C-alpha cells in the first residue's frame, strides 16, 4: 500500500463523508444516494424470525459494515438480497431495479456480487480458471457459438487479460497456474474477492472477509476493501472485528435477532447503548471499538493504517 493516499482516494473518502454527514443516526435512516433499498424483508425458520428488516438503505460509493452478534441474521440477509434464499415477504431494489425473487446469477449480472464466509473456490481448478469463471457475457457458453472460435476467442482473450490484471493487483499472479485448493485460507479469500470483481460489479458484498486470515493478509485485505471504495464501488461487508470495522467503515448498520437496531458512523455506533447491549448485555460503559482493548502489535498496525489513509 502507498504511504500516502492518492488525490482520487482522498477525494472519494471526503465525498462519502460529506454525503453522510447529515444522515440521522437511526435505524432505517434515508441516504442521499442509496444504491440498495430494502423494505419489509422477512425470513422465518420454524416460526423464528431470522430476518425482520423494516427498512434499510445502503449509500452508493460507501463502505458500509453490517455487524451484530452471532445468529443476528446477517448472512441470511445477504442470502436473501443476492438470490441465494427466498424471503417470506419483502421487496428490495438495486440501482432502481427490483431484485426481489431474482435468481442469484441474474443478481450478479445486474451488478451486485458477493463473497462467502466459507470460500467457494473450485479446488481442482487452477487460480486462472477460477478467475475466468467469474466473468460475465461469455459467448462460448452458448452451444452453437462455442463451435465457432471466431465468436468466443476475442472475449476469452479480454477475460484472460482482465484476470491477469486482477491477479497482479491481489498479488496472486505467481499462483495463476496453481490449483485453488493449494492456496492458504487468506489467499483463497483474496481469490474470491478478485473473482467477484471479474463481473465488474457496482456493489460487492463481503461475508466476513477477515475470518481465518492471518494478520499480514488482514492488512492486505483491508487495503483492497478501501481501494474498492476509492475506485467508486459500493462495499457492504459483514464483520465481527469491531476494531477493523471502526478503522475502514464509512457507515455501520447493526442487526440483532433479525432486526436493525442502530445505524451511524463507526464511532457513534460503538458507543450506542443498544449496540453494546446486543453484544455485551448490560455493560453500557464499554466502547466496543476501544483501542485500549487491543494488544500493542495490532494497535500499531491500525495506527499505521490510519496514518497512511491521511
Predicted regions, residues:
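ABC-family P-loop ATPase nucleotide-binding domain
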Residues: 1-42, 284-310
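The feature captures the beta-strand-to-loop junction immediately N-terminal to the Walker
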Residues: 67-69
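A short, surface-exposed alpha-helical micro-motif characterized by mixed small hydrophobic
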Residues: 245-247
Amino acid at each position: 500500500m502507498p504511504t500516502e493516499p492518492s488525490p482520487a482516494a482522498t477525494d472519494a473518502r471526503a465525498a462519502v463523508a460529506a454525503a453522510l454527514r447529515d444522515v440521522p443516526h437511526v435505524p432505517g435512516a434515508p441516504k442521499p444516494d442509496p444504491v440498495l433499498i430494502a423494505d419489509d424483508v422477512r425470513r422465518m425458520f420454524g416460526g423464528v424470525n431470522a430476518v425482520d428488516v423494516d427498512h434499510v438503505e445502503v449509500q452508493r460509493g460507501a463502505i458500509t459494515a453490517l455487524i451484530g452478534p452471532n445468529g443476528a441474521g446477517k448472512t441470511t440477509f445477504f442470502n436473501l438480497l443476492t438470490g441465494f434464499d427466498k424471503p417470506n415477504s419483502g421487496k428490495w431494489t438495486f440501482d432502481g431495479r427490483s431484485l426481489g425473487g431474482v435468481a442469484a446469477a441474474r443478481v450478479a449480472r445486474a451488478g451486485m456480487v458477493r463473497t462467502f464466509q466459507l470460500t467457494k473456490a473450485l479446488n481442482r481448478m487452477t487460480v486462472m480458471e477460477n478467475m475466468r469463471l467469474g466473468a460475465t457475457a461469455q459467448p462460448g457458453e452458448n452451444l452453437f457459438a462455442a463451435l465457432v472460435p471466431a465468436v468466443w476467442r476475442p472475449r476469452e482473450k479480454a477475460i484472460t487479460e482482465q484476470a491477469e490484471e486482477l491477479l497482479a493487483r491481489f498479488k496472486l499472479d505467481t499462483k495463476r497456474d496453481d490449483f485453488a485448493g493449494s492456496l492458504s485460507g487468506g489467499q483463497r479469500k483474496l481469490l474470491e474477492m478478485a473473482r467477484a470483481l471479474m463481473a465488474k460489479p457496482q456493489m460487492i458484498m463481503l461475508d466476513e472477509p477477515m475470518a481465518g486470515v492471518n494478520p499480514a493478509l488482514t492488512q492486505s485485505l483491508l487495503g483492497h476493501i478501501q481501494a474498492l471504495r476509492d475506485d467508486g464501488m459500493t462495499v457492504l461487508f459483514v464483520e465481527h472485528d469491531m476494531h477493523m470495522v471502526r478503522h475502514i467503515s464509512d457507515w455501520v448498520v447493526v442487526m440483532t435477532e433479525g432486526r436493525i437496531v442502530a445505524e451511524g458512523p463507526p464511532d457513534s455506533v460503538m458507543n450506542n447503548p443498544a449496540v453494546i447491549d446486543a453484544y455485551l448485555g448490560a455493560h453500557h460503559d464499554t466502547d466496543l471499538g476501544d483501542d485500549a482493548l487491543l494488544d500493542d502489535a495490532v494497535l500499531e498496525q491500525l495506527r499505521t493504517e490510519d496514518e497512511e489513509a491521511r
